[in-house]
Amino acid sequence: ESLANRRYLYFAQKADVEGYNDVAAVFRSTAEGETGHAHGHLEYLEETGDPATGEPIGSTSNNLKAAVVGETHEYTDMYPGMARSARDEGFDEIATWFETLAKAERSHAGRFQKALDELD
């Protein structure tokens, strides 16, 4: 559901650029519905934890902790590994993109950690 939401918002942006405002509106309204579905899934998953990190979720404090864990994984493991693979396969431009994203994810982790620290 989350993936569909992001895809449809991307498709809506493309439709806007191409002048298909009515099509863009269909994509956006459907994306909003997909968001509702994803939120419903997450409400059920509060009992078992964040599917992305395994961390408890539900309260703002727990949600921030899960966000820090997720973003930290992305900047320390996921994107660096993807960048290495891309570079090894000769996709230097994509590797550079992944390295840029790793820096952004590090910033996100820091923002979430700061918010968590300010809660306590």
Enumerate the predicted regions with their spans.
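Non-heme di-metal
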Residues: 2-120
